[in-house]
Amino acid sequence: RRQLPDDAPTAPPAAGLPWTARLAALWSPAHARATLMLWLLWFTVVFSYYGMFLWLPSVMVGKGFALIKSFEYVLLMTLAQLPGYFTAAWLIERAGRKFVLVVYLTGTAASAWAFGNADTQGALLLYGALLSFFNLGAWGALYAYSPENYPAPIRASGVGTAAGIGRLGGILGPLAIPFLGAQGWSTGAIFGLFAATLMVGVLAVALLGRETRGEQAVG
């Protein structure tokens, strides 16, 4: 049929490109900045999430709480994840993707440091809940933001490789706590490392990321 002026342009299918071409496209001058930013972002978010949350019960036991009580406290902390996710989802269309990611990642980093250095039940519950709130909010913004950085022919490859880098972080994060603990690191120092890692993600978004709110997806 005749193509009308308002017809969306047809993009070449991603499946028609070999994977080597799609990978090369991710590091082309047009997309290298976004790729570096997303790889850093996914690594820091997944590294910190699995590193911290899989070990929360053990951390609580190490701070002097009984094992059963530790699981109860962790359950209470994780309930804060839902409002964190929903508030981030609400804010990304109003304040922008970069703003939400920077704020929620910074909140996660600050909460991680505070949790690692807390020594009372009230402080642990408060900072643990804030940690859950901000971390899952950052996850929500990350899922919305990542595909908006690439055109359709390489979008799946771009997000998939970034998520793959995140998976690497998800493997290394849980291994970090027992390894560093065996080297004599305190809980505060270990969670300080997670906080510093998260701030790398903050800098990546702030310095390398672009705001995609309101942009029309490139077909």
Predicted segments, located by residue:
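Multi-pass alpha-helical transporter architecture, strongest
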Residues: 195-219
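A membrane-interface helix-boundary motif in multi-pass transporters
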Residues: 181-196
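Interfacial helix-cap and linker-helix signal at transmembrane-aqueous boundaries
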Residues: 60-61, 91-92, 177-185
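Helix-to-loop junctions at the C-terminal end of transmembrane segments
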Residues: 86-96
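Extracytoplasmic gate region of multi-pass secondary transporters
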Residues: 27-86
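Cytoplasmic membrane-interface "Motif A"-like loop-to-helix N-cap segments
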Residues: 94-105
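C-terminal ends and interior cores of transmembrane alpha-helices
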Residues: 106-119
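Intracellular cytosolic loops and amphipathic helices of Major Facilitator Superfamily
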Residues: 1-34, 62, 215-219
